[in-house]
């Protein structure tokens, strides 16, 4: 489930045939880049396992780490060197794909404002963060394998679940500022309106911020990100420049639904279950294939590619299920936004704007939706909003226009 209100799909009547063809080509090429990137990673990991190159990579890591000293420190250093080498190899192989999908296509289709130098800086930051997380996570994982050869998968599953929660909470204060300009929302009337909306929902927020997307993209976006004391409202400058307050409010009401209805926690729980299942399968695969693969034992770092293949297989197989659950959650969030604001016209106009501005694909096929779409197609969302009636608005009265946070007359509940 996406935590951002990403509207990548458009209503039927939004596009001329020319724009429809353009959007279809754009999304087809983006999907192809995603598939090629995935295939590269799979081929790399499988090749390392079946060719025996992973054993050679481990020997190289051991030779580099040998001067560290005592065995326990040397083992940890070997893990770090191995992960570093594997990450660099993967990055080198995937760099052309990332450049094509993340820079070339965005500029070719008129969606990017970003200079090449800025894009490369962001890539370097992403690589550094990914390397840090990979090294820390793998070091923890192999420490647990060494500590308990039988139950490491269960303990690791719990540890990584805690890591997901921590990263979700820290994203708005540590990660987002590394890539985007964030400043307090200056438009007082809109800020008051959005804070009132959050208060009615019982979602404590630390403030409302302008999210500087225009340095990088022409796309619009909004989010309610973080947990607890780090939760904050984000509205992109690209959205502030083009959308009415009513449209922004209904977009944010959709985001609020994910927090009020516990969708964020549901998503993290689902991810944690997938990780646990992946680790369990990896443990069984390592038990069976460690010897035939030439590994010393299940704690041999040379088995990392095999572990990643087994664990990743679970997530890959479950992609259609994850997307189906996400689409159901997004439909529920749309209904919540309509109930809370009582403004289907603003919802429809916001969807249409997002569809055009973000170069949405008009009508993706069922198989494409099944494999790639975490949100319902936008024409479906618009039809649902157009069918919205007073009788379907439930027990959530809309906020009085202009009400200050302490004047809101209704508190949003989780609903049915």
Regions found by a protein language model. Give the residues of each.
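Loop-to-helix entry region at the N-terminal start of transmembrane alpha-helices
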Residues: 299-308
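Short linear segments in intrinsically disordered or otherwise low-structure-confidence regions
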Residues: 3-7
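Polar-ligand-bearing catalytic/cofactor-coordination segments
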Residues: 11-298, 317-416
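Hydrophobic alpha-helical transmembrane segments of polytopic membrane proteins
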Residues: 308-320
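Generic N-terminal initiation segments characterized by hydrophobic and/or small/turn-forming residues
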Residues: 1-2, 12
């Amino acid at each position: 489930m996406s935590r951002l209100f990403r509207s990548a799909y458009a209503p039927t009547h939004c596009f001329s045939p020319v724009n429809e063809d353009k959007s279809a080509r754009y999304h087809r090429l983006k999907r192809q880049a995603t598939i090629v990137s995935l295939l590269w990673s799979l081929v790399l990991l499988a090749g390392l396992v079946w060719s025996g190159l992973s054993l050679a990579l481990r020997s190289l890591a051991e030779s580099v780490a040998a001067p560290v000293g005592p065995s326990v420190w040397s083992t940890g250093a070997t893990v770090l060197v191995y992960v570093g080498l594997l990450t660099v190899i993967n990055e080198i192989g995937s760099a052309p794909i990332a450049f094509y999908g993340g820079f070339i296509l965005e500029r070719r289709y008129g969606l990017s404002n970003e200079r090449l130098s800025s894009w490369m800086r962001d890539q370097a930051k992403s690589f550094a963060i990914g390397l840090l997380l990979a090294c820390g996570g793998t070091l923890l994982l192999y420490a647990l394998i060494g500590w308990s050869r039988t139950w490491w998968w269960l303990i690791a599953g719990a540890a990584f679940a805690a890591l997901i929660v921590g990263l979700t909470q820290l994203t708005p204060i540590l990660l987002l500022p590394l890539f985007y300009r964030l400043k307090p929302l200056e438009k007082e009337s809109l800020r008051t309106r959005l804070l009132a909306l959050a208060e009615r929902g019982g979602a404590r927020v630390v403030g409302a911020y302008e999210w500087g997307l225009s340095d990088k993209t022409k796309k619009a976006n909004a989010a309610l990100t973080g947990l607890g004391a780090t939760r904050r409202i984000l509205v992109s400058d690209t959205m502030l420049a083009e959308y009415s307050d009513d449209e922004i409010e209904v977009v944010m009401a959709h985001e609020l639904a994910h927090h009020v209805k516990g969708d964020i926690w549901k998503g993290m729980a689902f991810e944690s279950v997938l990780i646990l299942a992946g680790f369990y399968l990896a443990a069984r695969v390592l038990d069976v294939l460690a010897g035939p693969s030439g590994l010393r034992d299940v704690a041999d770092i040379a088995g990392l590619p095999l572990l990643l293949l087994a664990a990743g297989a679970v997530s890959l197989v479950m992609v259609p299920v994850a997307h189906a659950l996400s689409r159901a959650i997004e439909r529920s969030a749309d209904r919540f936004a309509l109930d809370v604001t009582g403004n289907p016209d603003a919802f429809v106009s916001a969807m249409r704007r997002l569809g055009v501005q973000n170069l949405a694909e008009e009508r993706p096929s069922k198989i494409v939706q099944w494999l790639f779409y975490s949100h319902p197609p936008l024409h479906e969302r618009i039809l649902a909003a157009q069918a919205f009636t007073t009788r379907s608005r439930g027990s959530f009265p809309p906020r009085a226009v202009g009400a200050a946070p302490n004047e809101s007359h209704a508190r949003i509940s989780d609903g049915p």
